[in-house]
Regions:
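Segments of small-molecule ligand-sensing domains
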Residues: 337-341, 359-434
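C-terminal motif of bacterial Sec signal peptides marking the signal peptidase cleavage site
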Residues: 19-23
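Periplasmic-binding protein-like
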Residues: 128-140, 160-162, 203-206, 259-268, ...
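Bacterial lipoprotein signal-peptidase II cleavage site
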Residues: 24-40
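Beta-alpha junction/loop-to-helix N-cap segments that form part of ligand/metal-binding clefts
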Residues: 4, 31-34, 77-84, 97-170, ...
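Extracytoplasmic "Venus flytrap"
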Residues: 45-87, 109-118, 140-141, 207-212, ...
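Extracellular/periplasmic Venus flytrap/periplasmic-binding protein
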Residues: 114, 118-119, 123, 166-281, ...
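Extracellular/periplasmic periplasmic-binding protein-like sensory domains
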Residues: 278-352, 359-365, 429, 437, ...
Length: 446
């Protein structure tokens, strides 16, 4: 029986706080300004964590995690799978004896919000830094991470995201990692999928967000390399819409006027307003493509068959049935709800396990020690492959080099702290507006 874990308690407290904050807060700085400021910092080429290092005597305290996950906002649907993945990982780690003989826990869970109000993530980052946790899981939005990564990693705290894909984040900080591949991998796969289906003229409906524009650029590059053309929403055209927009009549009208063969929607929760507008203007939804930001279960949002045969991509191969069962059981037991989406659950699980294994190999739970062993346990230096914390821990404790190969299927970290390889899952919508896994393409980062 799975007990109500410390992770579940932390998430419950964070959820209550997020609801209160959402009720009291107002819209403030948009993603353009916040992301722009963060990108300007990254362009300097300076490592925010350059002064951080492992202590001469590694910490022997119990390992504690912080989380920065979307409990509110346009990415809130990605919160449950990440929570389930992280919580299940905590339980599995502790069932195998914990780290350096002590149980691990999530002690500080916070709400990342989304890019429409960066004050939410800025406040959360301050809370996480004050809590002195060595590792923070999150954020899921690339724009949110760009808003807080300097703040978090300059304080010598590891930030590891299960879902960030913006290329701007590759090699951003020596204390920043991700278990999702950069957009160069997904963008190439999505572009090839669209053109491979016989579509020559492509329109983008894309929001002005680091994630949206970055992915659009890589998809466009793949489309044009395959002989296709972009007729609306392309790079440099100034046709992006702001995050949080709720009406799309003019954008859809303009996109359809360009007579595209296919439309690629790159957005988050805005998709729930874009799709009805496309339908009302007579668009064939089977010619619609989406990405990990919006390839989700819309069975409760649209009439049956609305998205039938539309397609989308999500980094990561489809989790095995047994792993999904564990996730749904954990979530139902600890959160009291059904788990409907699995996007980035495996990546969240792997992020927790990798950091725990790094602490075990380094025989210490401080951020510096963990950071020094992250590449090693991921297999960057070669090693015996192992797929569970329990099996890997036995090897590590015996002094054996390992390569952790978890449910997400990502390869070892490269020099930029990105996965060196990853799978991109291809999904097609059924008559209930649910994405159904079709196949996976493996790609390498560059």
């Amino acid at each position: 029986m799975i007990r109500t874990s410390s992770a579940a308690k932390a998430f419950a407290i964070a959820g209550a706080a997020a609801i209160l904050l959402a009720a009291c807060s107002t819209e403030s700085a948009g993603s353009g300004g916040a992301s722009g400021a963060a990108s300007a910092s990254s362009s300097s080429g300076k490592d925010p964590a350059a002064s951080c290092k492992a202590p001469s005597k590694p910490s022997q305290d119990a390992l504690e995690y912080g989380t920065l996950l979307p409990l509110t906002g346009s990415l809130a649907y990605l919160g449950p799978p990440a929570i389930a993945g992280a919580g299940l990982a905590i339980d599995d780690i502790n069932a195998a004896g914990g780290v350096i003989g002590k149980d691990v826990k999530i002690s500080t869970a916070t709400d990342s919000g989304d890019s429409t109000d960066m004050t939410v993530s800025s406040s959360a980052a301050q809370k996480l830094i004050a809590a002195k946790v060595p590792v923070v899981l999150g954020a899921e939005s690339s724009s949110v991470t760009l808003n807080v990564v300097d703040q978090i990693t300059s304080n010598c705290t590891i930030e590891i995201s299960p879902a960030n894909t913006a290329t701007d984040l590759s090699g951003y900080s020596s204390y920043y990692y991700r278990t999702a591949p950069p957009d160069t991998v997904q963008g190439s796969a999505l572009g090839q999928l669209v053109v491979g289906d016989g579509n020559a003229k492509i329109a983008f409906l894309v929001f002005n967000d680091a994630y949206g524009t970055g992915l659009r650029n890589t998809v466009q590059k793949a489309v044009e390399a395959a002989g296709g053309s972009v007729v609306y929403g392309g790079k440099g055209k100034g046709q992006e819409f702001p995050p949080g927009q709720t009406t799309f009549s003019s954008e859809v009208t303009a996109a359809l006027a360009a007579k595209p063969d296919a439309i690629v929607i790159l957005s988050f929760d805005e998709t729930k307003s874009i799709v009805p507008e496309l339908v009302s203007q007579g668009w064939d939804m089977s010619k619609t493509y989406m990405s990990d930001g919006n390839t989700a279960d819309y069975s409760k949002d649209f009439d049956p068959k609305t998205l039938l045969n539309g397609q989308g991509t999500i980094p990561g191969s489809d989790p095995k049935a047994a792993f999904k069962t564990k996730l749904t059981t954990w979530y139902k037991t600890n959160e009291g709800k059904d788990l409907h989406d699995f996007a980035y659950a495996a990546e969240s699980y792997d992020a927790m396990v990798l950091t725990a294994l790094a602490a075990e190999e380094g025989k210490g739970t401080d951020a510096g020690t963990i950071q020094a062993h992250m590449a090693s346990v991921s297999g960057a230096e070669g090693g015996t492959k192992c797929s569970t914390f329990a099996d890997c821990k036995k090897l590590v404790d015996a002094g054996t080099k390992i390569q952790y190969t978890g449910p997400s299927g990502v390869g070892p970290f490269n020099a930029d702290n990105d996965p060196s390889s990853a799978y991109i899952g291809i999904y097609k919508y059924d008559q209930d507006n649910k994405p159904v896994y079709q196949s996976a393409i493996q790609g390498s980062t560059k």
